[in-house]
UniProtKB/Swiss-Prot annotation:
Residues 1-18 form the signal peptide. Coiled coil: none annotated. It comes from the Eukaryota. It comes from Drosophila melanogaster. One of its GO terms (cellular component) is extracellular region. It is found in: Secreted. Secreted immune-induced peptide induced by Toll signaling. Has a role in resistance to bacterial and fungal infections. The strength of antimicrobial activity appears to correlate with the overall level of expression. This is Bomanin Short 6.
Amino acid sequence: MKLLSITFLFGLLALASANPLSPGNVIINGDCKVCNIRGD
């Protein structure tokens, strides 16, 4: 079940990264205001 949730999370990140219309401040967790999807 843990692996499934991790795979699902990476799937969501891949979709968000591939979407040119996604804003730069995609909320990944509750209190993240200015998240960078790529993490840099």
